[in-house]
């Protein structure tokens, strides 16, 4: 039986979340927020003390099982997440007080506490200073992305000096070129042998990482509009021993972005499998599902950021040129299915 539990830490986490909402209201009305920040730090300190006491009891026992190590990881993530939320608000407060920062009010109706960034309709507030979101990746807190005009994308394939197949997506309007090396066995024979654009656009096959890289780097909305008849190959999370799954870009695609080092990601996995089963029964071939283990791979981390992911696990739906996000760490299977249902009804 596990000795360590994180139930008490969740109590402190909820208190900080509630104070964060209070901070937003006072911040928008121009009132002082210093007292709220002070309360949040006190609560965080209480959580640290509680965690230290748990660790002390654990150290005295000297008999740890796998569940104990799992909970240690979850507790660490919980404490770190508390501090991250407080730091974001401290930065807001500091910039307004010391730098003459002219703020734009935080919209509480479109404000989701679970995100590691505070997003409003205007600025995105991160760990340094507010940055203006671009039209391509701007996402409101209701989940719907900003839609761009459709640009034409032309796929091209060639072999590099090492004889490795290289696939490029060439945006003919912006002149952006996304190039990726791929194994020849993931590109069908008719694609290798046929170089005209019409046939290529109907025969695109890539693995999960390649698909998401191209989807995000050339902007999901443009690709989805332009490749309605194209196919990509995504590695299905249940077939990681070599099996592959053909995904059509024109269909809604649900991706679970997770990291194997994250306790919340591991905790969410059983719920994700329930989501998969439920969605497949309900929607059949109308929805495509996959997972991407970001791990500590730099390319995959960039992919997740380009897709609007700010923490793990996060479920992202690519639909009709828009992206919709749901932070899944504390979400139940029913929560995710409801999120998918609401998105599909848009």
From Swiss-Prot:
Record's keyword terms, sorted: Virion
InterPro entries: Thioredoxin-like_sf, Thioredoxin_domain
Domain of life: Viruses
Subcellular location, record wording: Virion
Transmembrane segments: none
This protein's record includes keyword Hydrolase: no
Disulfide bonds: none
Keyword match Acetylation: no
Gene Ontology cellular component annotations, sorted alphabetically: virion component
CDD domains: PDI_a_family
Pfam family, one: Thioredoxin
Domain Thioredoxin residue range list: 212-345
GO molecular function list: protein-disulfide reductase activity
Protein name (record): Thioredoxin domain-containing protein R362
């Amino acid at each position: 039986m596990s000795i360590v539990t994180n139930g008490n830490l969740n109590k402190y986490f909820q208190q900080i979340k509630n104070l964060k909402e209070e901070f937003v209201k006072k911040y928008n009305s121009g009132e002082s927020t210093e007292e709220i920040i002070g309360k949040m730090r006190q609560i965080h300190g209480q959580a640290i003390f509680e965690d230290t006491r748990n660790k002390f009891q654990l150290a005295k026992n000297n008999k740890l099982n796998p569940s104990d190590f799992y909970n240690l990881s979850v507790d660490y993530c919980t404490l770190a997440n508390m501090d991250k939320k407080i730091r974001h608000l401290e930065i807001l407060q500091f910039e307004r007080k010391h730098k003459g920062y002219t703020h734009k009010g935080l919209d509480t109706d479109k404000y989701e506490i679970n995100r590691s960034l505070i997003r409003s309709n205007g600025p995105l507030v991160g760990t340094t200073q507010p940055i203006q979101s671009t039209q391509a990746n701007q996402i409101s807190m209701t989940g719907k992305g900003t839609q761009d005009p459709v640009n034409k994308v032309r796929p091209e394939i060639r072999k590099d000096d090492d004889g490795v197949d290289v696939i490029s997506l060439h945006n003919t309007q912006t002149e952006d070129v996304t190039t990726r090396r791929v194994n020849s066995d993931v590109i069908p024979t008719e694609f290798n042998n046929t170089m005209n654009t019409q046939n290529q656009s109907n025969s695109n096959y890539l693995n999960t990482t390649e698909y998401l890289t191209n989807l995000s780097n050339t902007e999901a909305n443009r690709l989805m509009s332009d490749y309605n008849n194209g196919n990509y190959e995504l590695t299905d999370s249940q077939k990681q021993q070599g099996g592959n799954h053909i995904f059509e870009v024109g269909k809604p695609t649900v991706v679970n972005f997770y990291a194997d080092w994250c306790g919340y990601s591991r905790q969410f996995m059983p719920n994700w499998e329930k989501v998969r089963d439920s969605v497949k029964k309900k929607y059949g071939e109308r929805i495509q599902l996959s997972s991407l283990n970001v791990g500590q791979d730099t390319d995959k981390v960039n992919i997740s950021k380009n897709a609007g992911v700010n923490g793990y696990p996060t479920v992202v739906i690519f639909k009709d040129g828009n992206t919709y996000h749901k932070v899944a760490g504390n979400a139940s299977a029913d929560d995710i299915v409801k999120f998918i249902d609401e998105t599909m009804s848009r």
